[in-house]
Amino acid sequence: NTDPEQCKVMCYAQRHSSPELLRRCLDNCEKEHD
């Protein structure tokens, strides 16, 4: 079980093609660990 910070690091590592995709990834991190 990854913590939110670890999840966010993964999002940034993916280098999404658009800021919107990155934001969606980060939002999912928050939701998963609510």
Curated annotation (Swiss-Prot):
Subcellular localization: Secreted
The keyword Plastid is annotated on this UniProt entry: no
This protein's UniProt keywords: Disulfide bond, Protease inhibitor, Secreted, Serine protease inhibitor
Major location category of this protein: secreted
UniProt site (Reactive bond for trypsin): 15-16
Source organism of the structure: Veronica hederifolia
Keyword ATP-binding appears in the UniProt entry: no
Name used for this protein in its record: Trypsin inhibitor
Function, in words: Inhibits trypsin.
Miscellaneous comment text of the record: Differs dramatically in structure from all previously described families of trypsin inhibitors. Consists of a helix-loop-helix motif with two alpha-helices tightly associated by two disulfide bonds.
Disulfide bonds: 7-29, 11-25
GO molecular function: serine-type endopeptidase inhibitor activity
